[in-house]
UniProtKB/Swiss-Prot annotation:
Any one of the GO BP annotations: proteolysis involved in protein catabolic process
Annotated Zn(2+) binding sites: C15, C18, C37, C40
SUPFAM superfamilies per the UniProt record, alphabetical: Glucocorticoid receptor-like (DNA-binding domain), P-loop containing nucleoside triphosphate hydrolases
Keyword Cell wall biogenesis/degradation: no
Descriptive protein name: ATP-dependent Clp protease ATP-binding subunit ClpX
Chain ranges of the ClpX-type ZB domain: 2-56
Family matches, as PANTHER family: ATP-DEPENDENT CLP PROTEASE ATP-BINDING SUBUNIT CLPX-LIKE, MITOCHONDRIAL (PTHR48102:SF7), ATP-DEPENDENT CLP PROTEASE ATP-BINDING SUBUNIT CLPX-LIKE, MITOCHONDRIAL-RELATED (PTHR48102)
Self-association state and partner proteins as the record states: Component of the ClpX-ClpP complex. Forms a hexameric ring that, in the presence of ATP, binds to fourteen ClpP subunits assembled into a disk-like structure with a central cavity, resembling the structure of eukaryotic proteasomes.
Function: ATP-dependent specificity component of the Clp protease. It directs the protease to specific substrates. Can perform chaperone functions in the absence of ClpP.
Organism for this UniProt entry: Enterobacter sp. (strain 638)
Alphabetical list of InterPro entries matching this protein: AAA+_ATPase, ATP-dep_Clp_protease_ClpX, ATPase_AAA_core, Clp_ATPase_C, Clp_protease_ATP-bd_su_ClpX, ClpX_bact, P-loop_NTPase, Znf_CppX_C4
Length: 424
């Protein structure tokens, strides 16, 4: 590097790019028979920065998966629920397309489309939201609506949701503003009755009111690094209009509200259309006919429903669907336990009748896919406890009798003569 000095021959040095002498610039950087001044270095940096800004949006746009690609990715992890996947794929694609192209297109302001998922426990609502966030590589956080209260009351403030999202991305505001928030048990904050009450409902309608602005879009002031709020503190400003909110709930009893509306429309008394019990719609079919007026009768306020324009309904999982969930997805439960046993150098086999028994047990418990893990865990608990202390075990076999609790898993040892059933 040369700094305002002549070379060994006493010759004056010049920048090879702009032609300025060493006396006209602060620094000259020497290369093989060439020199560049600090001003030209700054200019090069500016040019590169501008090019990066121009190229970045195009890269982002090309990186956004299409609705078909989103649906295909969901298929790898979530069994069934095809209508819900389609609705989610379109809604998520449109949301991130709006972010990547600005909030306006040709002067038309693009509205925000948050999502409401309605379906029974264990039908895949949370898994769908998590899978979407993983595909899009955006921060994701979950909140339980039952713990939320209005500001000033004992409980969790709604702005804590944004704080959790910031924690997921090390308080990077730009990343957080592209994240996904899933609010579970949203049906539990329904109004206690159809008519507005003069008494304060801090965990029901009050929470809906508090969530309105957050979901629609506001600038939330969040204390940095999870500190408590106080007047002298500088807050992080997070624009929630760019955050995708997905609300989910079981909405137990909503099918009866819909059924009443549908059946009332078909007439009553002598002019009514009489339907046999077998002809009446099941819960899944009824939920797919949900209208805003049904949600209002259930206890959600009209303003809150208006902030969740995209509604997707999920059906209760059938026995066949539960069997598929056990073995087909990329992170299927049986594959997870097989990987766990492989770490001990042991193979794990689930017989087909065992999978059927697990699914039947989950159907009886009415826990959906969520209950599958606890059933498998209970069946394998003793084996997982003993296995690390045992030698020469090559394989563990799970059949129907193991799931029903009649026998323990079959342990197959390396030496044929040592083959025996555990616990015999």
């Amino acid at each position: 590097m040369t700094d305002k000095r002549k070379d060994g021959s006493g010759k004056l040095l010049y920048c090879s790019f702009c032609g300025k002498s060493q006396h006209e610039v602060r620094k000259l950087i020497a290369g093989p028979s060439v020199y560049i001044c600090d001003e030209c270095v700054d200019l090069c940096n500016d040019i590169i920065r501008e090019e990066i800004k121009e190229v970045a949006p195009h890269r982002e746009r090309s990186a956004l998966p299409t609705p078909h690609e989103i649906r295909h990715h969901l298929d790898d992890y979530v069994i069934g629920q095809e209508p819900a996947k389609k609705v989610l794929a379109v809604a998520v694609y449109n949301h991130y397309k709006r972010l990547r192209n600005g909030d306006t297109s040709n002067g038309v302001e693009l509205g925000k489309s948050n999502i409401l998922l309605i379906g029974p426990t264990g039908s895949g609502k949370t898994l769908l939201a998590e899978t979407l966030a993983r595909l899009l590589d955006v921060p994701f956080t979950m909140a339980d609506a039952t713990t939320l209260t209005e500001a000033g009351y004992v409980g969790e403030d709604v702005e804590n949701i944004i704080q959790k999202l910031l924690q997921k991305c090390d308080y990077d505001v730009q990343k957080a503003q592209r994240g996904i928030v899933y609010i579970d048990e949203i049906d539990k904050i329904s109004r206690k009755s159809d008519n507005p009450s003069i008494t304060r409902d801090v965990s029901g309608e009050g929470v809906q009111q508090a969530l309105l602005k957050l979901i629609e879009g506001t600038v939330a002031a969040v204390p940095p690094q999870g500190g408590r709020k106080h007047p002298q503190q500088e807050f992080l400003q997070v624009d929630t209009s760019k955050i995708l909110f997905i609300c989910g709930g079981a909405f137990a009893g909503l099918d009866k509200v819909i059924s009443h509306r549908v059946e009332t429309g078909s007439g009553i008394g002598f002019g009514a259309t009489v339907k046999a019990k077998s002809e009446k719609a099941n819960e899944g079919e009824l939920l797919s006919q949900v209208e805003p007026e049904d949600l209002i009768k259930f206890g959600l306020i009209p303003e809150f429903i208006g902030r969740l324009p995209v509604v997707a309904t999920l059906n209760e999982l059938s026995e066949d669907a539960l069997i598929q969930i056990l073995k087909e997805p990329k992170n299927a439960l049986t594959k997870q336990y097989q990987a766990l046993f492989n770490l001990e150098g042991v193979d794990l086999e689930f017989r087909d009748e065992a999978l059927i028994a697990i699914a039947k047990k989950a159907m009886i418990r009415k826990t959906g896919a969520r209950g599958l893990r606890s059933i498998v865990e209970a069946a394998l608990l003793d084996t997982m406890y003993d296995l690390p202390s045992m030698e020469d075990v090559e394989k563990v076999v799970i059949d129907e009798a193991v799931i029903s609790g009649q026998t323990k898993p079959l342990l197959i040892y390396g030496k044929p003569e040592a083959q025996q059933a555990s616990g015999e």
